[in-house]
Amino acid sequence: MNIIPCSIKTLKGLYDISGVEVGQHFYWQIGGFQIHAQVLITSWVVITILLGSVIIAVRNPQTIPTDGQNFFEYVLEFIRDLSKTQIGEEYGPWVPFIGTMFLFIFVSNWSGALLPWKIIQLPHGELAAPTNDINTTVALALLTSAAYFYAGLSKKGLSYFEKYIKPTPILLPINILEDFTKPLSLSFRLFGNILADELVVVVLVSLVPLVVPIPVMFLGLFTSGIQALIFATLAAAYIGESMEGHH
């Protein structure tokens, strides 16, 4: 007779132990505006890591690169090749944008698994990777949308909008809808993957010994890197598409 109440108590106990909080946020009031503090704090940490790493690695460049300098030169070459492949010969001005997107998302994703965010206690919610928040991923997707609109308009002028009625005006609604679905797919793909990965690891750590979730954490690091690469590749592809005018 007491099986159901005991089961409910057991499940409630496991939920309390897990400490998974979804939708809990900590806000700052600045100048009458409500600011999402969790995202700002973790984003500042990620930006500091990126800037600090670059400064340390290249503050004294050598003719024969050191390990740190060699690593960053390899990363730059990788981003340059990615941009050239997706955008074409006019890729040069877009390397900083694609590189910034890739590195910020990559370090943000990895920070969710490697940095002990829970050490910092907040009145509400808890810190996590910046890309674990839909606000961040939507902002990145909107920046990408603005970038490919700018790329198309700067090269073609107002004739850029002719693409909406090609190859036939009947496709006008579909072509317009496509520009709305691009940022949606970019933002929700990144947000969903990172959130799911962190929740799985947190739940496993709370329910089983520490050794068991380690393979899942390594898998999460791999998929996090892949998500950063996918986002940067799609951003570059959209920019290249807007400049070339093909689908």
From Swiss-Prot:
Keywords, comma-separated and alphabetical: ATP synthesis, CF(0), Chloroplast, Hydrogen ion transport, Ion transport, Membrane, Plastid, Thylakoid, Transmembrane, Transmembrane helix, Transport
Any matching Pfam family: ATP-synt_A
Locations listed in the record: Plastid, Chloroplast thylakoid membrane
InterPro entries per the UniProt record, alphabetical: ATP_syn_F0_a_bact/chloroplast, ATP_synth_F0_asu, ATP_synth_F0_asu_AS, F0_ATP_A_sf
Bilayer-crossing regions: 38-58, 95-115, 134-154, 199-219, 220-240
Superkingdom as given in the UniProt entry: Eukaryota
GO MF, one annotated term: proton-transporting ATP synthase activity, rotational mechanism
Membrane topology summary: Multi-pass membrane protein
GO cellular component: chloroplast thylakoid membrane; plasma membrane; plastid; proton-transporting ATP synthase complex
Record-linked PANTHER family: ATP SYNTHASE SUBUNIT A, CHLOROPLASTIC
NCBIfam families: ATP_synt_6_or_A
Function, as annotated: Key component of the proton channel; it plays a direct role in the translocation of protons across the membrane.
SUBUNIT field: F-type ATPases have 2 components, CF(1) - the catalytic core - and CF(0) - the membrane proton channel. CF(1) has five subunits: alpha(3), beta(3), gamma(1), delta(1), epsilon(1). CF(0) has four main subunits: a, b, b' and c.
Assigned protein family: Belongs to the ATPase A chain family.
Protein name from the UniProt record: ATP synthase subunit a, chloroplastic
Native organism taxonomy: Eukaryota, Viridiplantae, Streptophyta, Embryophyta, Tracheophyta
